[in-house]
């Protein structure tokens, strides 16, 4: 996982509430055996017409938003079935953070495990962020737990252990390996006849 301390980037807003994991990444893409290469499948049913061509009315197809790294969205983002692939698609598109009113709990955890920072902000803040032009930038300061845009700033909460994972770039296994010596000593203690 990449470290995340302070990120500055542009936004892309899909302000729908109740976006589920099947809308994020349809089931036909779950057969892939790799953890990378899902960017073209993100919001597949909304991004493409039935003939496979781009839907010009969908914001992910807006040429001015192709470098957006912060997704602004509605309430209950990522509800539905457990689908880690959906977070891989967000990450592969280039999103470093998703700002929503609330998250499906499984998607929230999958974000924290895959380096996409999930941030919950109130509707008024998200509405302000959703109106930004393609070139206006937003800064996310994780150490201060703030989202900053021009003269606006909003505080967000995050569990201290998840915050540490982002700040250090460590995943669950990396954090466990910090205790390798203690784990080995404990294993010797409980199995002295090895």
UniProtKB/Swiss-Prot annotation:
Disulfide bonds: none
Membrane is among the record's keywords: no
Record EC number: 4.2.1.33
GO biological process: L-leucine biosynthetic process
Pathway assigned in UniProt: Amino-acid biosynthesis; L-leucine biosynthesis; L-leucine from 3-methyl-2-oxobutanoate: step 2/4
Single Gene Ontology MF annotation: 3-isopropylmalate dehydratase activity
Enzyme class, UniProt record, top EC level: lyase
Keywords: Amino-acid biosynthesis, Branched-chain amino acid biosynthesis, Leucine biosynthesis, Lyase
Catalyzed reaction equations: (2R,3S)-3-isopropylmalate = (2S)-2-isopropylmalate
InterPro entries named among the record's database cross-references: 3-IsopropMal_deHydase_ssu (IPR004431), Aconitase/3IPM_dehydase_swvl (IPR015928), AconitaseA/IPMdHydase_ssu_swvl (IPR000573), IPMI_Swivel (IPR033940), LeuD (IPR050075)
GO cellular component: 3-isopropylmalate dehydratase complex
NCBIfam families, per the entry: leuD, PRK01641.1
Reported function: Catalyzes the isomerization between 2-isopropylmalate and 3-isopropylmalate, via the formation of 2-isopropylmaleate.
Matches recorded under HAMAP family: LeuD_type1 (MF_01031)
Subunit field text: Heterodimer of LeuC and LeuD.
Family: Belongs to the LeuD family. LeuD type 1 subfamily.
Name of the featured protein: 3-isopropylmalate dehydratase small subunit
Species of origin: Limosilactobacillus fermentum (strain NBRC 3956 / LMG 18251)
Gene: leuD
């Amino acid at each position: 996982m990449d470290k995340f301390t302070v990120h500055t980037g542009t936004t892309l807003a899909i302000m729908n509430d109740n976006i589920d994991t099947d809308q994020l990444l349809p089931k036909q893409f779950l057969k892939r055996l790799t953890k990378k290469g899902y960017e073209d499948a993100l919001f597949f049913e909304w991004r493409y017409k039935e003939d496979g061509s781009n839907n010009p009315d969908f914001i992910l197809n807006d040429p001015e938003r192709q470098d957006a790294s912060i997704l602004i969205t509605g309430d209950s983002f990522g509800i539905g079935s457990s689908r880690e692939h959906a977070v891989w698609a967000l990450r592969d598109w280039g999103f470093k953070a998703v700002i929503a009113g609330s998250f499906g709990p499984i998607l929230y955890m999958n974000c924290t495990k895959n380096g996409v920072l999930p941030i919950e902000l109130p509707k008024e803040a998200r509405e302000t962020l959703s109106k930004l032009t393609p070139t206006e930038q937003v800064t996310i300061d994780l150490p201060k737990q703030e989202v900053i845009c021009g003269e606006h700033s909003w505080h967000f909460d995050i569990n201290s252990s998840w915050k540490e994972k982002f700040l250090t770039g460590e995943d669950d296994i990396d954090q466990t390996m910090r205790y390798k010596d203690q784990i080995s000593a404990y294993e010797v203690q409980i199995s002295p006849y090895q």
